[in-house]
Amino acid sequence: MVESSRCGGTALRNLLGDKGTILVVDDEASIRRILQTRLEMIGYSVVTASDGEEALSAFRLLTPDLIVLDVMMPKLDGYGVCQELRKQSDVPIIMLTALGDVADRITGLELGADDYMAKPFSPKELESRIRSLLRRRNDRTTTAAISNLGVMVVDNLKIDTNKRQVYKAGERIPLTGVEYSLLELLMSYPGKSFTRGEILQQVWGYNPEQHADTRVVDVHISRLRLKLEDDPENPEYILTARGSGYFFQRVAQLEH
């Protein structure tokens, strides 16, 4: 059953200001209750769902600004929900997983999630990551030098910086908001190597004190290569700087 309640009443929400709607999906009622209470106390509207099917119904009905999504759930697990959502939306997704294996944790990222946290997790850290992702989503402008320059071209790739859209050989390539921001950052400074930590700060908005897993960056780079490179195993655009990070090795041209 999809649930929505307002902790603290209308007066408190008006005082804090509505920061957006978050969909919390978890089959554990205690986790749903804790997250809903904490997030509403700091100004978010929160809707909860207890399984994957409810989550998809809630998304279609409410179009939330961000989703906190558990992996292990009845009916349809978090992986399945993430796959379905990515067919129609680039809404930020933070996955929660109790699975101990690193490969299991990374699977959600490979399916299009923006970030993940392992259970048990710190609610305060989750709140911080939510703020970071929503801030990046709401503020589409970046410090990147190419922002709003129009259409940029590299071989058969076209990047419309105004519409935040990418095309390959004339076909639009669907990118999540994080994937686009990552590509834009690297393309802004061709040849410049960015460490994983710098990318987490620039793209995810995390500060150095946040102990985010840098493998999040690696998985998103892999997803970009799969979508943009003719041969992802031997990339021509996004290269690895050994022992450092990643860089974009080609200089884009403005389309006139």
Regions found by a protein language model. Give the residues of each.
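Conserved acidic segment of CheY-like receiver
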Residues: 18-30, 35-39, 67
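Short, Lys/Arg-enriched segments at the junction into DNA-binding effector domains
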Residues: 18-21, 131-193, 197, 248, ...
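Basic, amphipathic DNA-recognition helix from helix-turn-helix-like DNA-binding domains
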Residues: 27, 83, 87, 92-153
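Short hydrophobic/Thr-rich beta-strand motif most characteristic of the beta2 strand and flanking loop
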Residues: 43-50, 58
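Acidic catalytic/metal-coordinating carboxylates
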Residues: 51-54, 77-80
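Active-site beta3 strand of CheY-like receiver
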Residues: 62-68
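Receiver (REC) domain active-site loop signature in two-component systems and cognate sites
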Residues: 73
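Positively charged, aromatic-enriched patches within helix-turn-helix-type DNA-binding elements
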Residues: 165-177, 181-236, 241-244
